[in-house]
Curated annotation (Swiss-Prot):
Gene Ontology CC entries for this record: cytoplasm
EC number: 2.3.1.181
Compartments where located: Cytoplasm
Boundaries of every BPL/LPL catalytic domain copy: 27-202
Name of the protein: Octanoyltransferase
Gene label: lipB
Catalytic activity: octanoyl-[ACP] + L-lysyl-[protein] = N(6)-octanoyl-L-lysyl-[protein] + holo-[ACP] + H(+)
Principal localisation: cytoplasm
Note: In the reaction, the free carboxyl group of octanoic acid is attached via an amide linkage to the epsilon-amino group of a specific lysine residue of lipoyl domains of lipoate-dependent enzymes.
Lineage: Bacteria, Pseudomonadati, Thermodesulfobacteriota, Desulfuromonadia, Geobacterales
Amino acid sequence: MICKDVGVIGYAEALRIQEQLVAKVQQGGEEALLLLEHLPVYTIGAGGSRDNVLDPELEPVRVNRGGDVTYHGPGQLVCYPILDLSRRGRDLHRYLRFLERFLVELCAGLGVACHTVPGRTGVWTGNGKLASIGVGVRRWVSMHGFALNVSPDTAPFSRINPCGMPDCRITSLSLELGEELFVDDLKETVAIRFQPFLHLHLPR
């Protein structure tokens, strides 16, 4: 698996890189893991509702992933796995549960206890949502992925119903631990842990 850290990047550029990697995997190339932070952007999934955009001046980017409207910005660790799911069971539900499990165990290793909520994709603590997940597939190659709140400004989330949930509070690793963390501090940990976790829980 290729691991690429592309730093802080605009959404359109990140999408372009994903599409290039997806095409390579479709042609039998190596799977990839993109690690990044986005410049501030609101996105909305293919089935998302405009009703969840509370600020009428907002124009979220419509993208080919599941889920509703969300915010991405500095302080979020965004991870886009580009995986050949045709060789991993062709089960999108199982893949979503795999990502949740990875996040729960990753955060536990950092000292933050979190959990999933039945019927709601993502990861929570008792204080709010810690990570959001939205994926898409093209000919059974995955794109998009998860966004883990490390130390983002949470104010932009007030302009939307995050993930389509009016009651959704937002938390972060920094808020949970009471100390400031940085995305760059976690990239290596995610890169090291993701591949063996993938082979264990979602083998080819």
